[in-house]
Amino acid sequence: MAAAKTLLEEPPYAKRQKGVKLDTVGFFFLSLWLVCLQIVLDKGNDADWFGSTWICWLTFISCVGGICFLISQIKGKNPLTDLSVMKDRNFFFGTVIQVVLMGVMMASSTILPTMLQSMMGYTSFLSGISMVPRGAGCLVATLFSALFISKIGERKMVFWGLVILGFGGLAFGEINLQISLMNIGFPNFLFGVGMIMAMVPLIELSCRTLRNDQLTNASGVQNLLKNVGAAIGTSLVTTCISRFGQMHQNMMVGKLTELNPAFTERLQSYAMSFVSNTDMASATHMAKNVLYNQLLQQSTLWAYIDTFRLFAIASFLIAPLVLLMKRKNLV
C-alpha cells in the first residue's frame, strides 16, 4: 500500500474530477441484482432451479434489481457507471467475448479437477498437478504474444487464440476413463495458450477507441460483466453435467435388455465370476449391479465430454466477433 501510494499517481483527467458523488440508488439496485443472482447461481442446481419457489422469487428480484439498475444508470444525473461506453463497437464486442471467455475459463478450471477426483480416483494433489500444463501454456502464450503481437496484429492474435481454445475443448471431448495425466496435459496446454492469446490483446483492443476519461469507467463495467460471466459459466456447467448425465443414462438404460446380445453376454460373464461364492440368482443380481454402476459411470463421463465440447462450440462462435472490431485508434 505504501509503494502504491508513493509510486502511483492519478492521471490529469482524474485530478480534474471534483465533487464526485456516490449514486446510492444505483448502488442499491446493483447490490440487489448481484446478490440475488449469485445466490441463484450457487444454489440453483441443488434446489432444482425453477422447481423451487424461493429460487423463482430470487430470480424475479434479481431481474427487477437489474432492470432498475439499468434505468437508474440511463436516467440518473450522477450514475454509478456510464453505460454509454457500450455504444463503442470495440468495447461492446470485446466485452461480450471476454464474458464468454471468462465463463469458459472458470468453468473448465472447476470441472476438470472434480472429474479427475470423482471418476478416476485422483487425489487432490494429482488433480492440481493436472492443471500445471495450463499454467505452462499461459507462460508460453505470454511470451509469444509479447514477441509477435506487433507483427500479426491484435485481432488475428485474439482470433487464433479463440480457435486454439476451441481445439482444446475438442481435445478434452476425446477423453476416457483409461487416460493418464499426460493425456490431460495436451488439452490443458491448449487451453492455457488459447486463453492468454485471446485475453491479453483483447483487453487493449476493446478499450482502444475510448477516450482517456472513459477508461476507468469502462474498466469497471468490463470487470463487473466478466465476473458475472464467470459465475454464470461455473453454475451452468454444474447443471449441464447433471442434466447431460441423466440424458445419457436414459439412453443407455434402453440397451440393457435381454434382447441385446452384448448385454446378455456380459451379464452371464459377470454372473459366472460371482457364482462360485453364492447361488446363481444372487450372482445374477450382483452382475446387474456391476453393469448398472458401469452405466452410471459412462453416462457421467459422457456428460463431461459434452460439456467440454460446449466450451469448444462457445469459443468457435465468438471468434468471428473479433472481425467486427476496429483496428485503428480513436483519432
Segment roles from a protein language model:
Residues M1-F27, S52:
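Helix-loop-helix hairpins in multi-pass membrane proteins, especially solute transporters
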Residues M1-K5, L30, L58-S62, D306-L323:
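Symmetry-related core transmembrane helices of the 12-TM Major Facilitator Superfamily/SLC fold
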Residues M1-P12, S72-P79, A136-G137, N250-R266:
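Hydrophobic alpha-helical transmembrane segments
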Residues M1-T6, I67-I71, L170-E174, R243, ...:
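Membrane-embedded alpha-helical segments of multi-pass transporters/permeases
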Residues L22-F27, L34, Q38-I39, D48-N217, ...:
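Transmembrane core module of solute transporters
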Residues L41, L116-Q117, F148-I149, L236, ...:
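Interfacial helix-cap and linker-helix signal at transmembrane-aqueous boundaries
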Residues I97, V221-L225:
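Hydrophobic alpha-helical segments of secondary membrane carriers
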Residues K226-L317, L321-L324:
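Hydrophobic transmembrane architecture of multi-pass small-molecule transporters
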